[in-house]
Amino acid sequence: MPQYRSRTSTAGRNMAGARALWRATGMKDGDFEKPIIAIANSFTQFVPGHVHLKDLGQLVAREIEAAGGVAKEFNTIAVDDGIAMGHAGMLYSLPSRELIADSVEYMVNAHTADALVCISNCDKITPGMLMAALRLNIPAIFVSGGPMEAGKVKWEAKVISLDLVDAMVKAADSSCSDAEVDAIERSACPTCGSCSGMFTANSMNCLTEALGLSLPGNGTVLATHADREQLFLRAGRTIVDMARRYYEKDDASVLPRSIVTFQAFENAITLDVAMGGSTNTVLHLLAAAREAGVDFTMADIDRISRKVPCLCKVAPAVADVHIEDVHRAGGIMAILGELNRAGLLHAELPTVHSKTMAEALSRWDVMQAHDNAVFEFYKAAPGGVPTQVAFSQNRRWKELDMDRSHGVIRDRANAFTQEGGLAVLYGNIAEKGCIVKTAGVDESIWTFTGRVRVFESQEAAVEGILGDRIVAGDIVVIRYEGPKGGPGMQEMLYPTSYLKSKGLGKECALLTDGRFSGGTSGLSIGHVSPEAACGGAIGLVEEGDSIEIDIPNRRIHLAVPDEVLTARRAAMNAKGHKAWKPEGRQRVVSAALQAYAALTTSADTGGVRDVTQVQR
């Protein structure tokens, strides 16, 4: 029978000093026999996805206490990728994932907490906390802040839905007046919550449902809706029950590594491919698998992507569908239900809320549910009022979207495409693979051959695009922006948005060892591995070369003879300490980022740290 971890600092005569400090936090005599539950919150006033979380940790804490536990809240950092986008701030985004994971580990282990509630939401916070939960392997549950309502604006006598990407694209479109751009800017992000499309934050919060670590609706019920409060309350009650099951009944099935197995990662990437999730999810799932000790690789993602259909298309893949529309169609449980009926899901796996996923689907999949409360839950609608307050409205749709032939969520027979929304490409320029979000690529350019235009940084590429140096048929190559080469693996949302604003969204491709925002669409191929800074062939590409892209056959090829590439590699290696570094790039890299770069790996392993580089 495992002992409560907290007894290390609460039991015995020698812990009198520690207990004195615990008492100073408000603990009483009777509390020292209870499970101590850590609440990792991520409130910050910098990030709209987190601005409403300030009081939600204490909401969970009160529920933990009512269920017989002791709650102790702490906070992590949170970087807003949208605000950090397009300047040096983006260098810090991916490294913040490791800091978040480490900070959760530090706090939980230093204070010997028994279990963990993760209150996350945006791009690197959910992955960082997921990595920490799997690293710690104590009872854990996730509850996110929820998605933002989609923006609305009246445009040419018609009301259209908006999101962050629309503001970026229109701002770079010279045909849009200042007044039009201002109207979009003021309407694109109307409420608190994670940005409203199937971008990275929402993708990751949806994937926690598939992994079995969060409650139904976690990925889709709006931050502003009153229904979301119940997720926080249920999370507080559930985590105390999980702690007692593990420590008092020796039930290890509640531990993260018991729930998030190889098959659970298969479920997660199956959902990801089916819903056309952000390419960043691949990076984060690979990193999480490493923490879980699960041998889940790019090869597994490639295998799954070939057999899973695309059942759902959400912005940026389509302009008029957002997460609130996915919720109305039954949310993630509805997509998982369709995947299960197609024989593509491991439904026998446990979750934090049900004995098996199959049991959960029998209750929560609207196509097989019988409980009217479930139907009402998925009718939760946007309030349409700008606000930064959680649970501030209770509007409902009159009816659900149950149309599986032409609706937001499709069944397999009526899938958008029979191949899924993400694909892994391999070739001589990406021997360890690269990722493309096929859900956002027009099928007319699934095969594409173009002339290479080489840029040594995102900034240089933006200058080239806005300076009209890119024409139809070009392939923009941005290198030395990987985890090590950036460092920090910047997102390339501005270059792709500017290509769209120039009318080149279906006429050009972009290839990088960096990554893309979940808001990216078009023929945008990222995560090229090995990256240029690690000796990858993308570092050998020259201006005017030709690259062949073949998504149906999962192939990408630099059309240069092998002997020429061999000669280029020899010439590069002959540069000594200047080899595999960007020529002419002026970029200040702080000591913190240099430390990250020294340990990080390429995207094919999740951009995780390799501590063997410093082990003696």
UniProtKB/Swiss-Prot annotation:
Gene Ontology molecular-function annotations: 2 iron, 2 sulfur cluster binding; dihydroxy-acid dehydratase activity; magnesium ion binding
Residues that, per the record, bind Mg(2+): 81, 123-124, 491
GO CC list: cytosol
Binding site for [2Fe-2S] cluster: 122, 195
Active site per UniProt: 517
Residues with the N6-carboxylysine modification: 124
Cofactor note: Binds 1 [2Fe-2S] cluster per subunit. This cluster acts as a Lewis acid cofactor.
Repeat as UniProt keyword: no
Keywords: 2Fe-2S, Amino-acid biosynthesis, Branched-chain amino acid biosynthesis, Iron, Iron-sulfur, Lyase, Magnesium, Metal-binding
Class of enzymatic activity (EC top level): lyase
GO terms under biological process: isoleucine biosynthetic process; L-valine biosynthetic process
Cofactor(s), by name: [2Fe-2S] cluster; Mg(2+)
The protein's annotated pathway: Amino-acid biosynthesis; L-isoleucine biosynthesis; L-isoleucine from 2-oxobutanoate: step 3/4; Amino-acid biosynthesis; L-valine biosynthesis; L-valine from pyruvate: step 3/4
EC number(s) from the headed UniProt entry: 4.2.1.9
Catalytic activity: (2R)-2,3-dihydroxy-3-methylbutanoate = 3-methyl-2-oxobutanoate + H2O; (2R,3R)-2,3-dihydroxy-3-methylpentanoate = (S)-3-methyl-2-oxopentanoate + H2O
Entry keyword annotation includes Nuclease: no
Pfam families (UniProt xref): ILV_EDD_C, ILVD_EDD_N
Source species, domain of life: Bacteria
Regions that span the bilayer: none
Subunit structure: Homodimer.
Family under the similarity heading: Belongs to the IlvD/Edd family.
General function of this protein: Functions in the biosynthesis of branched-chain amino acids. Catalyzes the dehydration of (2R,3R)-2,3-dihydroxy-3-methylpentanoate (2,3-dihydroxy-3-methylvalerate) into 2-oxo-3-methylpentanoate (2-oxo-3-methylvalerate) and of (2R)-2,3-dihydroxy-3-methylbutanoate (2,3-dihydroxyisovalerate) into 2-oxo-3-methylbutanoate (2-oxoisovalerate), the penultimate precursor to L-isoleucine and L-valine, respectively.
Protein name as catalogued: Dihydroxy-acid dehydratase 2
Organism: Aromatoleum aromaticum (strain DSM 19018 / LMG 30748 / EbN1) (Azoarcus sp. (strain EbN1))
